[in-house]
């Protein structure tokens, strides 16, 4: 049985990040993630609160992890014991953020000079070093394989292959929801048996989501750039996902 985290001492917290608190459970191979309403942007230089965000992100993540599992993508998802809580398999995380881009937006627009909203001929995969102190810098394959030696060539190829598979599945699903999957960030790790699994979350916090009808933004960019109607956008994503995936 999983204890209610509210009854645990602070010392029981395994890790607290910007969006989630990770607690141990009686099973050392399983952790409990409590999703927070806290919001951050620009590497935590901007902070705030989005009411209901924790429950939205946990529920959307649960639906999408289940979709991916059914499609043959191993993930760390186990169950959703409460609206803002998910049970995950404990992973040894790879210190890379894997970003998949279908449409030019954000930093890609700044780096290339291409107009935001430009549709790419095919999805591209980028890798960033997961290090807040360094600002999560963009890496190329040479940096990863020869400097950081974070993963080997076969592992890097598997990360890229898996990310593109996830993109194909989620893009098709979101299209059915009337949403365009612009870009998104993934994190991976290895379970106790050494199997690569998709970790972290899949939510409006780490996915750029625009409506198909009018490219209306439904993600954290609304908070990031003070666009207003942030809570409504998150709730709309949740409603569209549940309408397609089921309660």
Curated annotation (Swiss-Prot):
It catalyses: 5-amino-1-(5-phospho-D-ribosyl)imidazole-4-carboxylate + L-aspartate + ATP = (2S)-2-[5-amino-1-(5-phospho-beta-D-ribosyl)imidazole-4-carboxamido]succinate + ADP + phosphate + 2 H(+). Pathway: Purine metabolism; IMP biosynthesis via de novo pathway; 5-amino-1-(5-phospho-D-ribosyl)imidazole-4-carboxamide from 5-amino-1-(5-phospho-D-ribosyl)imidazole-4-carboxylate: step 1/2. GO terms for biological process: 'de novo' IMP biosynthetic process; cobalamin biosynthetic process. CDD domains: SAICAR_synt_PurC (cd01415). Pfam families: SAICAR_synt. Keywords: ATP-binding, Ligase, Nucleotide-binding, Purine biosynthesis. The keyword Isomerase does not apply. GO terms for molecular function: ATP binding; phosphoribosylaminoimidazolesuccinocarboxamide synthase activity. Its EC number is 6.3.2.6. Belongs to the SAICAR synthetase family. This is Phosphoribosylaminoimidazole-succinocarboxamide synthase.
